[in-house]
A protein has these predicted regions:
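Active-site cores that bind ATP or allylic diphosphates and position pyrophosphate for catalysis
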Residues: 86-181
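N-terminal Rossmann-like or analogous alpha/beta NTP/dinucleotide-binding catalytic cores
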Residues: 1-127
């Protein structure tokens, strides 16, 4: 409902972020089903495909290409400090705060758990999802605000180091639904 209300005043892009979904264990058949279901839900919620752009992330190669470029200017330490990364690794039994990088890897391997690089790079892919379309306003939940701040930092870093290429986006956090976007 929040997104549908933006269609009159903005050029809107809505992604089915199937590549983000594979940062955790998944079933390919279930992912395909969920992708189609997400498109149907977008339309059922009032997102008019004639007035907005709905895309499947993995079908637009620019997302991964830009994510790679952004990863080359993203320090690993910035990614390891992301709250969502810490929370997800804690669920696997890791404590990012108390482990050196090498100890973190060895302890995880001994315990039979692992943290994949996709989980660590999730916010870089999210930044690519946003910057690819030169978005100036991004609806995010409070839980994603830190990722948007990284996106802003990456846009500014790229623009400073190379050329003014990216729009530095602002967060749009609606009062209603701020945690479920």
């Amino acid at each position: 409902k929040n997104w549908a209300s933006m269609l009159d005043d903005h050029v809107c892009y809505f992604g089915i972020v199937d590549m983000h979904a594979i940062t955790v264990k998944y079933s390919p058949a279930e992912l395909r089903k969920n992708t189609l279901s997400c498109v149907a839900q977008y339309i059922a919620c009032g997102l008019d495909p004639e007035r907005s752009n709905i895309f499947v992330q993995s079908h637009v190669t620019g997302h991964t290409e830009l994510a790679w470029l952004l990863s080359c200017i993203t320090p690993i330490g910035e990614l390891q400090r992301m709250n969502q990364f810490k929370e997800k690794t804690a669920k696997l039994g890791f404590n990012v705060e108390k482990c050196s990088d090498l100890k973190f890897i060895h302890e995880g391997a001994r315990a039979g758990a692992s943290v994949n690089s996709g989980l660590l790079m999730y916010p870089v892919l999210m930044a690519a999802d946003i910057l690819l379309y030169n978005a100036d306003l991004v609806p995010v939940g409070n839980d994603q605000r830190q990722h948007l701040e990284l996106c802003r930092d990456l846009a500014q870093r790229f623009n400073h180091n190379y050329t003014d290429t990216f729009t530095v986006p602002e967060a749009y956090i609606p009062k209603q639904g701020a945690r479920i976007m």
